[in-house]
Structure formats: C-alpha cells, structure tokens
Design a protein with these regions (language model features):
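N-terminal leader/capping segments at the start of a protein or of a new domain
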Residues: 1-36
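Short acidic-glycine-tyrosine-enriched beta hairpin
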Residues: 96-126
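A short beta-loop-beta micro-motif enriched in histidine and acidic residues
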Residues: 54-58, 69-81, 106
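A short hydrophobic beta-strand segment most commonly corresponding to one strand
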Residues: 81-83, 134-149
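A short glycine-rich, His/Asp/Glu-containing loop-to-beta-strand
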Residues: 38-69
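Glycine- and acidic-residue-biased ligand/ion/polar-headgroup-sensing regions
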Residues: 78-97
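Short beta-strand His + acidic residue motifs that chelate non-heme Fe in jelly-roll/DSBH
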Residues: 71-74, 91-92, 121, 127-133
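Conserved double-stranded beta-helix
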Residues: 145-180
C-alpha cells in the first residue's frame, strides 16, 4: 500500500544519506504498485501537475501528461528522479553548444520510460518530454530542492535560444494543483 507520508520520510532519509541510488530505489518502490499509488493520488483523468510535497530540500510532483503532449527543452538546476506508473514518457536530452552559430543547444540522446521505469537526472541535465501515446501517461517526479520557485531556463522550440523558465509555457494545458 502506497503511504505518502512514509514515501516522503523515505525520500528524506535517502537525501540525508546523499545517495542518488537510494533516492532512485525509494521512487522505484513507490511506483512498483501502480494500483496502490492510484488509490492515493487518484486516477489520472486530465493532464496536470499535482504537488504532493513541497519544501526547501524536496519537491514531489504527480505529473500527468496529455496524449501526444510535448514540453519545451528545459533544465531543473537540481537533481531529479522520475518514476513511471502509467503510460510512457520519452525524454530527449540536450547539450549546450560550445560555439553556437544558430542554436544554443543540440540533441544529445534520449531515453524512453515505460511502466515501472525509474531514471535519475543530474542537476545540469536539459531535457524535453514527449508522451507518444494516444492516452494519458503518469509519473512521480522527485526533486532535491524547491522546484516550483527555482530559477531555471527553457529553450524556445523554434530558435533553441535560452530564456527564463515559464512553467505555463513548458507545461501548456497542464494546470498546477496542490494535492497535499
């Protein structure tokens, strides 16, 4: 049975250990039983970002992607762990171009995440996300900082020019809800 308070306590313990692997293991346990998790967070019926926990050293979000939804490239400036409990999330990773003549970033790989998959993102990672499915996808996103107010960047889809992060532009059509 997924217990949000215990999940947060386990994440805090992993943060205290300064172990990214321990964080990954906690998230893996959290998404290992999607039915139990869904009983706590609710069945995803529309795209949204729901805040499950927010603090200066830890933010936990329930992210529900619309069918075929794509985000702009963006960074977090903090480490993250993503755990899928429904559908799929395709991540494109980007790297800064050292001597840009046109674009400031370029593709540098990718990773498809499916049901039960968990991945770590380092604090300097730039990525964009696609839900390639014709149905909703859902994931728990854990950040080792105060994610919602952090100074971050995003890149314009057409020009790939860096600009200040605007959550509404990155997550178009995904309302932010406080689900605590």
């Amino acid at each position: 049975m997924f217990d949000l308070d215990q999940f947060i306590a386990d994440l805090r313990a992993a943060l205290a250990e300064r172990s990214r692997q321990a964080l990954k293991e906690v998230v893996a346990r959290g998404v290992s039983d999607p039915a139990s998790l869904l009983r706590r967070v609710g069945e995803p019926d529309q795209p949204a970002v729901r805040v499950l926990h927010q603090g200066p050293d830890l933010t936990v979000l329930n992210v529900v992607w619309a069918p075929k939804q794509v985000t702009l490239p963006h960074d977090h400036r903090m480490s993250a762990v993503i755990g899928m409990y429904g559908g799929r999330e395709d991540n494109t990773f980007w790297r800064r171009v050292s001597n840009p003549t046109k674009f400031q970033i370029e593709p540098a790989g990718g990773r498809a995440l499916g049901l039960g998959d968990v991945t770590l993102l380092g604090r300097d990672v730039i990525h964009s996300v696609l839900n390639p499915l014709t149905k909703i996808s859902a994931a728990i996103h854990v950040y080792d900082g105060e994610f919602l107010t952090a100074q971050r960047s995003m890149w314009d889809a057409e020009t790939l020019v860096e600009k200040p992060y605007d959550i509404s532009a990155v997550t178009t059509g995904m309302p932010l809800h406080d689900a605590r």
